[in-house]
Amino acid sequence: MERIQSDTMKLGDRIKAYEHQFTDYKIDPSLPFIARVDGKAFHTYTKRMHKPFDYRFIKAMQETAKKLTETFDPILTYVQSDEITLLFKPTTEAFLSGKLSKMNSVIASTATYWFSKFIDPETPTVGLPLFDCRVFNVPDEWEAINALRFRYRDAVRNAVSSAARYKVGHKKCDGLNTDEKLKIIGSDWKGYLMEARYGTFYHRVNVEKPVDIDRSKLKPEVAAKIPETCIRTEIQEYYVKLATSWSNSLPYQLDPIYMPLNSPAAGIDDIKNATDVIFRGEDAVLYANGEETTET
């Protein structure tokens, strides 16, 4: 790195020029992009918490993920352990002008603030809860889904390892794969909550709500102008509607089937048209038994 000659630029402009060399990098808003929020040294921060899963910690992470979804408006948020992944669809201009330095710092500081608010003060911790963030583009929708699949699989693998180590100790788990560890855990595995085993997906949805107002205190002509309901946005756990084309041959109408996206039966790893489901809200088509998940 070379020094800018002082006789060609004022001091303030010169210092800003150094700064801009490192802070002007931007994501491409025309492509999907992901923000991965990660707890800094949380192995130490959580070492005194209940094992294998401390539900006070899980709840605080879930609430933090919901606040990040509310604040930054990704199309999908996935939280597992001390990680939160935010998926953003292509747009004309990303928030904070797409500047990576600002996006990383603002998302990380927002996560740190809200987690500190949500964590139960009685939870035994070591050190401070700090988060970092890495924002990056992916080339297309399919790779965006694969990024989520990777995080989902990593979450399950780590959860299985935690439960197995808790049951028999670290040494007996050395060299074992996930299936072998699941055999060690046995029926105890299903006794843990879904969010501990598979993480949780969230998104923003529009919900019709009744207008909460005492119309008896209003003049009739005023009350008549106020609608009975209004549309509000809420952050909810992500459920997918399963495609049931086979039901068209039945002589009766079936109710729609909805499954949480973290379900081991109809989760993100099981959805054949995951890009259409996540990016366009279509009904989910599951892989057939024995059909391999396609990755390209």
Language-model region placement:
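Regulatory and interdomain segments flanking nucleotide-handling catalytic cores
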Residues: 1-296
